[in-house]
A protein has these predicted regions:
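Short, charged interaction patches at domain edges and termini
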Residues: 1-10, 44-52, 92-127
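Hydrophobic alpha-helical membrane-association signature
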Residues: 3, 72-76
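Broad gene-expression machinery/nucleic-acid interaction feature
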Residues: 36-38, 56-58, 108-112
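Short, conserved charged micro-motifs
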Residues: 67-71, 122
Length: 127
């Protein structure tokens, strides 16, 4: 199971986060002169074992102002707290919500979280 895609799909299923949408990368038309509300998800680490995946994820919220980026980050963290509604997700820890301006000056916040996901291990995966 791809944890990044799982979180992107989970966030995009919530109409309360719109007009922001989540993806694995920034939209091609995004720029510092035309900031739009957007959410990016990337795996930054974590552990894997035969039966459990514990991905560490950085979820970044981009918006026209620092306040809007912060507000979106809070909304995202609330949504992610309920990802355990998906059967394979056993637990989620929200580790931080941080002001994280982009190098080009765009307002951005980062939600760092760690999921605990049940995996389906088979002997054929050992090879």
């Amino acid at each position: 199971m791809n944890a990044e895609k799982l979180v992107v799909d989970w966030l995009n299923a919530d109409p309360g986060l719109r007009p922001a949408t989540a993806s694995l990368s920034m939209p091609p038309d995004a720029s510092s002169t035309s900031p739009t509300a957007h959410i990016t998800v990337e795996r930054t680490g974590g552990t894997e074992s035969p039966f459990v995946s514990r991905p560490l994820l950085a979820i970044q919220t981009w918006a026209a102002s620092r306040w809007n980026a912060s507000s979106l980050a809070v909304d995202v963290s609330r949504r992610v707290r309920h990802i355990t509604d998906i059967d394979e997700v056993a637990d989620v820890d929200i580790l931080s919500i941080t002001d994280f301006p982009s190098p080009d000056g765009r307002p951005r916040y980062q939600v760092t979280c760690q999921l605990t996901i049940k995996t389906n291990y088979t002997e054929s995966e050992e090879a």
